[in-house]
Amino acid sequence: MEESKQNYDLTPLIAPNLDRHLVFPIFEFLQERQLYPDEQILKSKIQLLNQTNMVDYAMDIHKSLYHTEDAPQEMVERRTEVVARLKSLEEAAAPLVSFLLNPNAVQELRADKQYNLQMLKERYQIGPDQIEALYQYAKFQFECGNYSGAADYLYQYRTLCSNLERSLSALWGKLASEILMQNWDIALEELNRLKEIIDSKSFSSPLNQVQNRIWLMHWGLYIFFNHDNGRTQIIDLFNQDKYLNAIQTSAPHLLRYLATAFIVNKRRRPQLKEFIKVIQQEHYSYKDPIIEFLACVFVNYDFDGAQKKMKECEEVIVNDPFLGKRVEDGNFSTVPLRDEFLENARLFVFETYCKIHQRIDMGVLAEKLNLNYEEAERWIVNLIRTSKLDAKIDSESGTVIMEPTQPNVHEQLINHTKGLSGRTYKLVNQLLEHTQAQATR
């Protein structure tokens, strides 16, 4: 069983696309879920920590792993080096940090970056060296795990930095800091800022652009499954052509998260049809229970397959670091996204099954929905009561009878018009491109 859980674990595919500090919450989750032996996780944590300045944390884990009170000599020496380097960077950044901590001095700053740089040089003898020192100090603070300090200094650095590459690096650092502090609103703002820069025409090379989009989507997973509006935001980002192409060519594992968002997000239901076409293209080359569930329901109409996949999907969700967030309620622990997913998945199965059959045996339906007979009956009664379903239950024969629905002429007209407007838009675009090509010859 543990092995099958590990087969669904996307950490080996996701971790290389994250800053190493962002991998720690994933390790914490995997350790809590006991997906891997404790010793294996602790060793991986130490390996990761050795590439950061969080030496005290590494020492604690070493003691826990090897059941000792002593830390290795190299860790003790590394700690001395880190403290000395921090002190040195603190001194180099001190003039600018003192200025930023002085409210009266900060009031002299304006929206004009060039004016600020000149004013700092003339009045406070603060030049490029001190600004560079602030960046190095902020970066070092981040490496030490002081995300709050790093976020503040990186923000200030960006207001003074005139180097675009450095400014971009600082923005990535600011995004990581906000994610690690779980400031989801601010993190979303920083994510959108980064997206704007990455999508701009002036952004380095197309290849670099694709790589940055892939990183952005991976980092965004933390925000999308924690922010109140995240399930809509993930669809709006991942479903854009440029981002969807990047997923299909370089990161198909991200389809799990887009598919989950579509299943639990009723507001984006109209876009699901287009996403099903993507699944048709991808589901032979990339296997994931959540993708396969959608293929069973909407591509193959395989309801027995969908029933099996629902059980696998539940396993996937509770063991996924982004989807399996647990909420403690008294003595009970629940996974809200799992419950929401299963409810909507049943609805998908039911709606599609009902389009094919007009009279449905309740026992068969209960089996397809992974419910017992009484649960299925209650579930359907509730759907009818809340007007989500135009049907009635024949208790004597134990069947659900679907009421024939007349096609809504108004809806059909809107759908045809949408299709026409889409084709017209493409046609106009092609004509414009052709005209521009003629003009440049």
Swiss-Prot record:
- GO terms (BP aspect): DNA-templated transcription initiation; flower development; formation of cytoplasmic translation initiation complex; photomorphogenesis; translation
User: Any keyword Lipoprotein?
Assistant: no
Show the SMART domains listed in the entry: eIF3_N, PINT
Q: Which family does it belong to?
A: Belongs to the eIF-3 subunit E family.
Which species expresses this protein natively? Arabidopsis thaliana
Q: What happens when the gene is disrupted?
A: Several floral development defects, including delayed flowering, reduced sepaloid petals and short stamens. Male gametophytic lethal.
Q: What induces it?
A: Targeted by the COP9 signalosome to proteasome-dependent degradation.
Miscellaneous: The PCI domain is protease-resistant.
Molecular functions (GO terms): mRNA binding; translation initiation factor activity; translation repressor activity
| The entry's keywords | Cytoplasm, Developmental protein, Initiation factor, Nucleus, Protein biosynthesis, Repressor, Translation regulation
Record-given protein name: Eukaryotic translation initiation factor 3 subunit E
Q: Which InterPro entries match?
A: eIF3e, eIF3e_N, PCI_dom, WH_DNA-bd_sf
Instruction: Give a GO cellular-component term.
Output: eukaryotic translation initiation factor 3 complex, eIF3e
Q: Does the keyword Iron apply?
A: no
Q: PANTHER family this protein is in?
A: EUKARYOTIC TRANSLATION INITIATION FACTOR 3 SUBUNIT E (PTHR10317)
